[in-house]
A protein has these predicted regions:
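Charged helix-capping and loop-helix junction motifs
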Residues: 131-135
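C-terminal accessory "lid"/substrate-recognition subdomains
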Residues: 142, 154-185
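Nucleotide-state-sensitive switch-loop elements of NTP-binding domains
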Residues: 2-7, 12-128
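A short alpha->loop->secondary-structure connector
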Residues: 104-111, 136-137, 163-170
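A short, aliphatic-rich alpha-helical micro-motif
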Residues: 80, 137-140
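Short histidine/acidic/glycine/proline-rich micro-motifs that form metal-
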Residues: 125, 152-154
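Residue-level signal for inorganic ion chemistry
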Residues: 35, 89, 143, 149, ...
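Well-ordered beta-strand positions
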Residues: 115, 144-145
Length: 185
């Protein structure tokens, strides 16, 4: 089972990205949703749109407060559903570095962690930087690929500025500024 983390702040477009990903693949996918509240809104959206298995954890954050439950859930998914891919959508304020560390501690030969993706809302990036600077930096620094959402109406100069800004934090990441529905399979 390959594990893909799709991180990003609330409203950045994680669920839409995952829905598009699930629609395009022919592989079996399970999606692990981590949201706050009694029921996961994003999980309901994904259930409507796709025929994937959805696992939800709505109490606590998988990167810090419920690490043990999270690890147990990953092993349960691997041993019962055993999908080709497990896509993890953490809460918008999760520390990507902590989540990667937690997954790296799970010792199971049938699990492989893929390079993580962070979705960044191009229209809210300044707010993220000002209100959540540590999380903002972490989600960029530990992502292998950064996908900017909501760039449809941005000029190329604005996109270039965004690329430069995140490249200063993570010079090795792949940056995508086109809408992800236009990406090749």
């Amino acid at each position: 089972m390959k594990i893909l983390i799709v991180s990003g702040f609330l409203g950045a477009g994680k669920t839409t990205f995952i829905k598009e990903l699930a629609k395009r693949t022919k592989k079996e996918i399970a999606i692990f949703e981590n949201e706050y509240g009694t029921s996961g809104v994003d999980g309901d959206i994904l259930k409507e749109a796709t025929n994937v298995n959805i696992w939800e954890l709505t109490e606590g954050c998988i990167c810090c407060s419920v690490k043990g439950d999270f690890a147990a859930s990953i092993l349960t998914i691997a041993n019962t559903v055993n999908p080709d891919y497990l896509v993890i959508e953490p809460t918008g304020v999760a520390m990507l570095s902590n989540l990667i560390a937690n997954l790296s501690q799970i010792e199971y030969e049938h699990i492989r962690l893929m390079a993580p993706i962070s979705i960044v809302d191009a229209l809210s990036i300044e707010r993220y930087k000002n209100e959540f600077p540590e999380i903002y930096k972490d989600q960029i620094e530990f992502a292998d690929t950064l996908v900017f959402s909501k760039t449809e109406n941005l000029a190329n100069e604005e996109k270039d500025k965004l690329n430069l800004e995140v490249s200063e934090i993570n010079p090795n990441c792949k940056i995508i500024t086109d809408h992800y529905s236009t990406l090749p399979d």
